[in-house]
């Protein structure tokens, strides 16, 4: 059976079209090109739902060669664009390779009047390494060398992942590759209440509150590095609706194997609450929420802690009963004390 020349030419044209990665059909994204981006999710919270779009206003990505751990690229995005549906950081121009990627989110915040809360290491592409990447909480260093913080903190988030960026030498990896980066929140709001057992109104000016922990320096993997102890002071104090008083703190990451120590002192110098571990107290109610979590997962998910202490007629807390996030807690031992 003979074939006409025109039939053969038509067959060749069709084959060429199929080999062109559907560029005729998908003119905006030829499938013979590999493209890559990074998307983000923050569902590591007590809602167990993604709240990235409403909570994060800046992201900084560091891409390290997986073998040498040398920094190969940095990407930064900030502003209202992060609230867009399916926001992603485009990796166009990133060299092909296998990468360990670290994300710090919330460091850059130009939209409000708060000073910067955190500073990232000064990193140089081509020479800096993964182990040099740190995030440091800003603090006041006083003349005696002690470190203090009484500021509200911008919400800080951290995440890590691994990814491969494909180049022209991987024709079987064409198309779009999107990597999802899960975030954990590193900042916490702590609300401390003192409630009068006698019904007599307490004076907000009569109490001094501190939380002490050396947790202001975070490594690339979100672990705590050795740091000076930071004395946190409330950014706000006031009265409660009843006869009590309250103080609000922002503190950096809480760790299950460490203690952040709360002390409340009255005007006479008497310790109302003396060196109590709020970390241990917070974990007393972990199992009340109906989710299976280990201690560190709970501390990473729960970013808001309320501790209510009843002050007796002698002006101190008994050390036996308190409320944690509205749950009544009866203490059977002194394990919460450092």
Residue ranges and their predicted role:
Residues 1-9:
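Bacterial N-terminal signal peptides that target proteins for export
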Residues 17-20:
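C-terminal motif of bacterial Sec signal peptides marking the signal peptidase cleavage site
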Residues 23-120, 125, 286-338:
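Acidic/polar, low-complexity intrinsically disordered N-terminal segments immediately downstream
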Residues 36-42, 191, 259-266, 322:
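Short, hydrophobic/proline-enriched secondary-structure or compact coil segments at domain edges
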Residues 60-115, 202-287, 338:
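Tryptophan-paired
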Residues 73-184:
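Short, low-hydrophobicity acidic/polar segments
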Residues 135-246:
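Acidic, serine/threonine- and glycine-rich low-complexity intrinsically disordered segments
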């Amino acid at each position: 059976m003979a074939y006409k020349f025109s039939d053969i030419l038509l067959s060749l044209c069709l084959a060429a079209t199929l080999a062109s990665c559907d560029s005729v059909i998908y003119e905006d994204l030829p499938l013979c090109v590999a493209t890559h981006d990074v998307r983000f999710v923050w569902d590591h919270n007590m809602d167990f739902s993604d709240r990235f779009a409403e909570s994060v206003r800046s992201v900084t990505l560091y891409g390290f060669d997986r073998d040498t751990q040398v920094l190969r690229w940095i990407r930064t995005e900030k502003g209202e664009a992060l609230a867009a549906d399916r926001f992603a950081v485009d990796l166009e121009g990133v060299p092909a390779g296998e990468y360990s990627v670290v994300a710090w989110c919330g460091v850059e915040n130009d939209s409000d009047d708060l000073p910067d809360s955190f500073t990232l290491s000064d990193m140089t592409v081509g020479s800096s390494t993964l182990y040099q990447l740190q995030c440091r909480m800003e603090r006041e260093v006083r003349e005696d060398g002690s470190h203090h913080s009484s500021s509200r903190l911008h919400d800080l988030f951290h995440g890590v992942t691994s990814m491969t960026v494909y180049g022209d030498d991987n024709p079987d990896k064409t198309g779009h590759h999107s990597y999802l980066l899960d975030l954990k929140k590193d900042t916490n709001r702590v609300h401390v209440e003192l409630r009068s057992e006698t019904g007599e109104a307490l004076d907000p000016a009569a109490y001094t509150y501190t939380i002490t922990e050396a947790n202001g320096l975070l490594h690339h993997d979100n672990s705590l590095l050795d740091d000076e102890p930071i004395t946190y002071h409330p950014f706000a104090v006031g009265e409660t609706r009843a006869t009590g008083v309250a103080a609000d703190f922002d503190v950096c990451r809480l760790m299950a194997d460490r203690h952040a120590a709360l002390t409340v002192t009255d005007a006479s110098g008497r310790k109302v609450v003396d060196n109590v571990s709020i970390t241990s107290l917070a974990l007393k109610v972990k199992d009340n929420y109906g989710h299976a979590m280990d201690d560190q997962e709970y501390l990473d998910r729960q970013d808001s802690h309320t501790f209510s202490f009843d002050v007796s007629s002698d002006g101190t807390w008994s050390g036996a009963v308190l409320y944690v996030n509205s749950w009544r807690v009866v203490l059977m031992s002194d394990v919460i004390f450092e």
